[in-house]
Design a protein with these regions (language model features):
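Mid/C-terminal beta-alpha module of Rossmann-like enzyme folds, strongest
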Residues: 27, 35-37, 42-45, 49, ...
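N-terminal Rossmann NAD(P)H-binding glycine-rich loop of SDR-like oxidoreductase domains
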Residues: 50-72
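SDR active-site strand-loop-helix element
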Residues: 53, 77, 120-121, 160-166, ...
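NAD(P)H-binding glycine-rich loop region in Rossmannoid oxidoreductase-like domains
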Residues: 76, 82-147, 151-154
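Conserved Rossmann-fold NAD(P)-dependent oxidoreductase catalytic core, especially the SDR/UDP-sugar
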Residues: 81, 132-136, 146-190
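Glycine/proline-rich active-site loop of Rossmann-fold NAD(P)-dependent oxidoreductases
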Residues: 170-172, 222-227, 255-263
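Conserved beta-loop-beta element that borders a ligand/cofactor-binding pocket
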Residues: 199-221
Length: 269
């Protein structure tokens, strides 16, 4: 136990030390240095060279634009080259996917080999109305993709993403009754028979990492969040819709993220 005199000396010493620290910045307690968390590395998607069939269609043009905006390069095989504007990163090849030789030309048109293929084909009609008379061969989409599959195999390309439709293949039972009648008893039936045949061919292809994207009713508009409703779309509503830009982004995303390989998926906004 300290005596009173010793206690006064200790208090005096502590007071002098505090005053000295206050008047001498060098002796002030320095703030503890903060260590910032390391920034997570940015995840960048490697650029790819894509072949797109159907690039001049409404959804195909948006798919092409979306892919180019992500620094991918594109080869587009189209019947009328003037239907697409010249754009950096875009190689346009004149031809039809019904001619296998034209697809082979498209594959050889760019210095870099094709990494993946996206198909946004639809059967041409007299007008933009889905009820108008078809002007393409009965199995235009199926036969085009058959040719594509042959050339893909020759070049060792495995990744294929196809824009199909809700109601094709095993998703037909999930349609509302009025839509079933519409798709099977109107001019739309030709397109769905083609989609069904294409669906079967893609599923039966060997050594192909395929994805069948089945959008519900297509409409115009910007990119919106996409709901994935499974292979058959059992929970899709009769009036569900999806914008073409949303579909375009989803198609490119499937290629970039390597998701849904060997799967079909119904998509809606």
């Amino acid at each position: 136990m300290l005596g009173r005199g010793e206690e006064l000396i200790r208090l005096h010493r502590e007071t002098n030390e505090r005053d000295s620290a206050t008047n001498n910045p060098a002796k002030k307690q320095q703030p503890t240095a903060r260590t910032l968390p390391k920034a997570k590395p940015l995840i960048s998607t490697p650029t790819m060279h894509l072949l797109i069939l159907g690039a001049s269609g409404r959804t195909g043009q948006l798919t092409t634009t979306t892919a180019l905006s992500k620094s991918h390069t594109i080869t587009a095989l189209i019947r009328n080259p003037s239907s697409l504007p010249a754009t950096p990163g875009l190689t346009i090849v004149s031809g039809t996917p019904l001619n296998q030789a034209d697809i082979e030309t498209a594959f050889a048109s760019f210095p870099h080999p094709v990494d993946a293929c996206i198909v946004t084909l639809s059967a041409p009609r007299e007008t933009d109305s889905p009820f108008s008379k078809p002007v393409a061969p009965a199995m235009f989409m199926r036969d085009s993709v058959r040719n594509l599959l042959v050339v893909m195999k020759q070049h060792g390309v495995r990744r294929l993403v196809v824009m199909s439709a809700f109601g094709a293949g095993d998703s037909f039972p999930s349609l509302a009754w009025p839509l079933k009648q519409l798709f099977r008893r109107s001019n739309m039936s030709f397109g769905f028979e083609d989609h069904d045949a294409l669906d079967a061919d893609v599923r039966g292809a060997e050594d192909v990492e395929w994805t069948l994207v089945r959008p519900v009713m297509l409409k115009e508009g910007g990119v919106k969040p996409v709901r994935e409703l499974g292979e058959t779309g059992a929970k899709a509503g009769m009036f569900d819709s999806i914008t073409r830009e949303s579909v375009a982004g989803f198609l490119v995303g499937c290629v970039e993220e390597e998701r849904l390989k060997g799967e079909a998926v119904v998509v809606a906004n």
